[in-house]
Design a protein with these regions (language model features):
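Membrane-interfacial amphipathic/re-entrant helices at transmembrane-helix boundaries
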Residues: 1, 42-43, 47
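Single transmembrane alpha-helix segments in multi-pass membrane proteins
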Residues: 1-34, 53, 57-72, 215-221
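Alpha-helical transmembrane segments in inner-membrane proteins
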Residues: 1-2, 39, 58, 63-64, ...
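Structural signal for membrane-spanning alpha-helices in multi-pass inner-membrane proteins
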Residues: 4, 8, 28, 32, ...
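Alpha-helical transmembrane segments in multi-pass membrane proteins
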Residues: 20, 24, 28, 51-52, ...
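Transmembrane helix-bundle core of multi-pass membrane transporters
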Residues: 74-145, 198
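Helix-loop-helix "hairpin" substructures at the membrane interface of multi-pass membrane proteins
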Residues: 121-198, 222
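Conserved small/polar residues in nucleotide/adenosyl-binding loops
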Residues: 226-231
Length: 232
């Protein structure tokens, strides 16, 4: 929900969070599988972080570019990107399946734990909580006290007003969706590298769609996300 909030505040209806999470997780899994026996663990994790952020950002950039240039319907384009991401994960599940013919990847680097994110106090969930808190603080400051956050608010209220005061709407749309997609990609990293240590087409578990409702119920306020009742 944190990842979708800046886009929603801009009135860009990013329904593609699920796909952006999947593609970020796929990028993390690719690093674990392809680099796990070639590079030190710390370097692999660094590559996973960069790859997941970049993959999510690219997945967010594509519908943003079409929206900015040709005013396409972002609800449809982001939704369709979910299906593409799902099929990509399904394809690479077959490519990387272990054992062959099983139709699944299984636990990645189970013997070496290369690419597994560190646990805090023996829990694989605490790291995700810490990251969520840090991003919440960042997002609150970004949306309420930065020039970029102000531009997001103005574009969300009225694109015509934004253009009148000299805000480059196309730039704001693309920049905001790069951020939104990157944060979704980070979620994929945490799911693959920190919790599940594998990737499947269902690894996001519908969180991308649940996040839409949670973000709405919190009125796009990062600090209120934790008080919003989950619809699940």
């Amino acid at each position: 929900a944190l990842a979708l909030t800046p886009a929603f505040k801009m009135k860009f209806w990013n329904i593609g969070g699920e796909g952006q999470v999947l593609i970020g997780g796929l990028a993390a899994a690719a690093c674990m599988i392809c680099l796990g026996d070639k590079l030190p663990n710390a370097v692999v994790i660094l590559c996973m972080i960069v790859a997941s952020l970049a993959a999510g950002a690219i997945w967010g950039f594509i519908p943003a570019f079409f929206k900015a240039k040709w005013n396409t319907n972002e609800t449809l384009s982001t939704l369709m990107m979910n299906y593409i991401a799902t099929q990509l994960v399904a394809f690479y599940t077959i490519v990387w399946e272990v054992p062959k013919g099983s139709g699944k990847i299984g636990i990645i680097n189970q013997n070496t734990n290369v690419g597994w994110l560190p646990q805090i106090f023996g829990s694989k969930y605490l790291l995700s909580i810490v990251v969520a808190v840090v991003i919440t603080i960042f997002m609150y400051v970004y949306l309420n006290y930065s020039k970029q956050g102000y531009e997001i608010s103005v574009v969300g209220e009225s694109e015509n007003t934004a253009k009148y005061v000299g805000i480059k709407v196309e730039k704001v749309i693309i920049r905001t969706m790069l951020l939104s997609g990157a944060l979704c990609g980070l979620v994929g990293l945490l799911l693959v590298g920190g919790i599940n240590h594998t990737v499947t087409t269902t690894i996001a578990g519908g969180q991308g769609f649940t996040a839409v409702l949670v973000s709405w119920m919190s009125k796009f306020n990062p600090c209120l996300l934790y008080t919003s009742p989950s619809p699940r």
